[in-house]
Design a protein with these regions (language model features):
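Glycine-rich phosphate/pyrophosphate-binding loop at beta-loop-alpha junctions
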Residues: 64, 83-193
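Conserved catalytic/binding loops enriched for acidic/polar residues
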Residues: 11
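Active-site-adjacent helical/loop segments in soluble small-molecule enzymes
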Residues: 183-213
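Generic beta-sheet signal
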Residues: 31, 54, 79, 145-147
Length: 213
């Protein structure tokens, strides 16, 4: 039968949902947070999805998307978890491990350090978990890196009180794909237990990195 899949994205995740729905001859609806690039919006629409940029930040857009899904009986495909919604995010995190495996298979030597970017922490948690499983007690030192304007994982680690901590507001950063203010609860269970450090970076560090690369 006909299904409608709905999601919030900064770009790549939503494009993947749109592509998959199109191949399955189903409908995809994609919402993007304020500040999302017009080119990314166009790429998602090119996959046949109904897509638009909201005037909300990422986390508020996720809540809006969830409300629409519940109201209309649509299937929400989100890469972050919350109370009562964990199965699909877990599947997505398991899928992210494919990238970790591909990187691992191409490593000429064992790395000494691993730096992982984090938005809600899903990708970082997946990669951290993969390498912790591969290397066990000899896992490379692993650091989680976030933009200073949206450093919810860093704030949760700094508080160290057993609770998740959010960052609110516009979440302004040039690191658009990482402009997320609320941690994925599943990812934090991994990151909080296995990561060696957490780094909150001002935008100029990302700009300098892009110039170097």
């Amino acid at each position: 039968g006909s299904k409608t899949f709905i999601t919030t994205t900064d770009g790549n995740h939503g494009r993947g949902v749109a592509w998959t729905a199109n191949r399955l001859k189903q409908q995809a609806i994609v919402y993007m947070p304020q500040g999302s690039a017009a080119e990314r919006l166009a790429n998602i629409r090119a996959e046949g999805a109904q897509a638009e940029i909201t005037d909300m930040n990422y986390d508020d857009t996720v809540r809006y998307t969830s409300e629409l899904a519940q109201k209309n009986g649509w299937i929400i495909v989100q890469d972050t978890a919350w109370d009562g919604y964990t199965r699909i995010p877990l599947w997505i995190m398991q899928g992210y491990m494919t990238m970790a495996l591909e990187a691992y298979e191409q490593l000429p030597v064992k790395p000494t350090h691993i730096f992982l970017q984090a938005g809600v922490g899903s990708l970082a948690g997946s990669v951290q978990g993969f390498f912790a499983d591969i290397y066990d007690s000899s896992c490379p030192l692993t650091f989680i890196v976030e933009p200073k304007g949206a450093d919810c994982i860093y704030q949760t680690a700094a508080a160290n009180d057993g609770s998740l901590h959010s960052v609110t507001g516009r979440l302004e950063t040039i690191m658009a794909g990482l402009a997320c203010g609320e941690p994925n609860s599943i990812a934090w269970e991994i990151l909080g237990n296995l990561s060696d450090g957490f780094i909150s970076c001002p935008d100029y560090t990302a700009a300098q990195g892009m110039r170097i690369l």
